[in-house]
Amino acid sequence: MKRLALALKQKKVASWKLEEVKELTELIKNSNTILIGSLEGFPADKLHEIRKKLRGKAIIKVTKNTLFKIAAKNAGINIEKLEQYLTGPNVFIFTKDNPFLTNMFFENYKLRRYAMPGDKAEEEVIIPAGDTGMPAGPILSVFGKLKVQTKVQDGKVHVVKDTVVAKPGDVIPTEALPILQKLGIMPVYVKLKIKVAYHEGLVIPAENLKLNLEGYRSNIAEAYRNAFTLAVEIAYPVPDVLKFTINKIFKNAITLASEIGYLTPESAQAVISKAVAKAYALATAISGKVDLGVKLPSAQQTQTQQSTAEEKKEEKKEEEKKGPSEEEIGSGLASLFG
């Protein structure tokens, strides 16, 4: 009797459901990644555009949550991990690609749809100048309410000039909706919201799927700058580092030469400038006691010269702090770590 009851129960299952479960089971087994997206508020007719974009990369299926659960169990997935996401109308994306990159596609890929009552404008909604193709009649009063200047020409309504009917953040006027539809204007952006990804046994909620590429890029650049600074300090022997190291060593050598008075063609200017500065300082100190017969620069001139010299030193320090440019960061990564 139990077998008969089971057989009768099995006969009641529609054949299309059995085929659907079989197909879903195979898709689950052959995919590295499964993403579940919400269809609430998303126009079902827009899925074909996503299918076209992902052709060859992913398979998109709209099916009942119960059928997916059965298929997932058949494929050996612990469905309890995904149970909380299997509510409401869902779409299932099967792919062999990385879940983060696949989610990035859905984050960035926006589709347009016609406005509905209560929709807010994300950008200016403009009724363009020109022939609307609409026959003159009651529609003229609607244009009037929207403060759109019109004229009738050959029995058709013509808009005199481009007119903004909603600014970003404004609710799109209800009166404008039929006009926008007739003109083929789709002012509302929609995107498929991914709830979760299942990747090789790992459940990844939507909030953990988002990649902060700018943050990663900034961190890598900062890490490279720090590594480059260290490499310059220890004179790490690669061409892109050594040109900075040699320049720094040369500057330090000139500074030391000017301090000890070591004269070479390269250090002559620094040594003489240092000596002149010391001589002026000494002369200024004793000028009140001894008549040197030499006109000394005023305190203001001396201060200006010192300020200029200090500014140049600060500029040099800033240049050293800045380190390599963005181009040098890009080209230097390979030579420093490769």
Curated annotation (Swiss-Prot):
NCBIfam families: PRK04019.1-1. This is Large ribosomal subunit protein uL10. Keywords: Ribonucleoprotein, Ribosomal protein, RNA-binding, rRNA-binding. GO terms for cellular component: cytosolic large ribosomal subunit. Residues 309-325 have a biased composition (Basic and acidic residues). SUPFAM superfamilies: Ribosomal protein L10-like (SSF160369). One of its GO terms (molecular function) is structural constituent of ribosome. Belongs to the universal ribosomal protein uL10 family. It comes from Saccharolobus islandicus (strain M.14.25 / Kamchatka #1) (Sulfolobus islandicus). It comes from the Archaea. Residues 297-338 are annotated as: Disordered. GO terms for biological process: cytoplasmic translation; ribosomal large subunit assembly. The keyword rRNA-binding applies. Residues 298-308 have a biased composition (Low complexity). HAMAP family: Ribosomal_uL10_arch (MF_00280).
